[in-house]
Amino acid sequence: MPYAELHCHSSYSFLDGASNPEDLVIRAVELGLSGLALTDHDGLYGVVRMAEAAEACGLSTIIGSELSIGVPEPQNGVADPVGSHLLVLANGPEGYRRLAEALTDAYLVEGGRKGRPVHDLDHLAEVADGHWTVLTGCRKGAVRQGLVKGMLQAEAELRRLVDLFGIDNVLVELTDHRAPTDSRDNDLLAELASRHSLLTVATTAAHYAGAEQFELACALSAVRARRSLDEMDGWLPPGPVARLRSGAEMADLFSRHRDAVDNTVAVAERTAFHLKSVRPRLPDQKVPDGHTPISWLRHLVEEGRRACYGDDPVAKDRLATELDLIEDRGFAGYFLIVSDIVEFAQSQGILCQGRGSAAASAVCYALGITVVDPVFYGLPFERFLSVLREEEPDIDVDFDARRREEVIQYVYAKYGRRNAAQVADVITYRPRSAVRDMAKALGYSQGQQDAWSRRSEERRVGKECCNMCRSRWSPYH
């Protein structure tokens, strides 16, 4: 039975999803899914890992996010977070770009901060401009939440989405996690969809790859809520209902709504795209009148050539070859930006130096970005930028750590806060903190938590602790 999962969370839905993107892709392939969407909460953090794994496995990927609406404050420490959800799927690269823009806006607007994005539906619809497919959501979706107050409220919420995003861009989502009202709610939602000539789609709203991750998912929920598993008992599902399912399982689960299962394949085909097709858009470059970015870059490089190489014909030919490729690939603006940042640092007496494969570029050397002469040392430019590779150039520049903030603020001021970003690693659990949090979730005392976390540093606790965890709590007991 063909089926594509359009609602799936990875471990990048922090303390909510229990499987990494690669495991989700592998499981989707094992189940024979036609496509898999990654829709982590309020972020696109896992899409690169997802896309790379899916490409290696030949799986179609859909990129989206589940947006949190009406969140008054960060929801860690809350058993059942407040607010509603809006599931967004990007329709191709342009939809992806617009989704990234909306997510950025949500954290930069007044009141937005880590754990508390501020989304406004009117603004989201304006940003989307027809480039998103919007699902009404699972139990946290405004339409499904509206059913609690009756069909009129649910219908009002559905009409609002249709008015904002367009009838061709809204899908009614059916999910079944075996809650007492799920079957009835799905029937009502299907009736609403029919009444408004909308398609339904069936989803798992998956939070882990397989049933074996269920206990971990429950433990993560307890950690997020800062409660023990016993205290979370009323909020946790009775079994591994949020796992990826095959098309046959979904057809059986939604036997009264088989069209909702069938529709997922067409939606996946319409929204899937290769992440590599997305290219960064550089901020506009201010160059002197009468110049384009490439002509100004050639001018600056010519000045650098005279200072660094004089009339050396080998260097002149090398620079001409590099500049032709840079022009052909449309990267002149990138070199101008890096050159400008380095020039600022040097003018302020801030120590800086380019490194890595950029040292193989005579253009970088002529601009003063790097200090190694690639012509003298015979370094091949192709190591840095090649016509045979589709990847963008990557110039790494180290700045004096004590004055790095000055450079960052200069970049923000000149290019705009929304045109610059800092890259950071995602912090993951170390053994000591993992043991401490799991022990707390399992209801052990503070003293036991401390003792086990200390033992984890001695590298003796892993398997023993897991066995104790299993003996202490099981969702099936």
Where are these regions (language model features)?
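Phosphodiester-processing cores and adjacent nucleic acid-binding clamps
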Residues: 1-457
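Positively charged, low-complexity/disordered segments
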Residues: 462-477
